Amino acid sequence: HGILTVNQIDMFLKAMPFELTYADDNNQFLYYNNAHQDPNTMFAKRVPSQSGGRMSTIHGSLPPARMKNVEWVIGTLRNGNQEYVRTIVPGSPAGVINTHNYQAMYYPDGSYAGINEIVFNFQPWLDWYLKETGQRLVGGSGPFAPAGGHGDADATSGASDAGGHSDADATSGASN
């Protein structure tokens, strides 16, 4: 809650230390906060001309197998199967843990309102935490599943890289 002006909200969002995006319930990409002069410096590369575009158009250059994963994330959140999907994009350079969090959003009446995405390099946060607490990471022999895990979320591949899921529809909107 608060009484921010539109300009204050814009400054607040632009100051966030991560990339934020929003796609509405009609699968239109409407907002991103980090307008870099060079989109290649972004983890989720976006340019101003994409605002207002359909998600299928924005991701249209992806190979079909990767597009199926984008469709799966959208469908999973749209259908309420999960509240969020978190991924780590494989193949990131050393010193980068490219993390994407896709979160379903809802209108006051409880109906689906779209997806917000938070993208950031988790490595500096992890390094800071380990330094501040004196802890360190140690190897293990199997996957780590924290208590209260979240469904079948795939934390080892990006939305564009996870296994094929075909039951989601990222090309039609709520009004189609």
Give the role of each language-model region.
Residues 35-131:
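Sensory/regulatory domains in signal-transduction proteins
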Residues 1-35:
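Sensory modules in modular signal-transduction proteins
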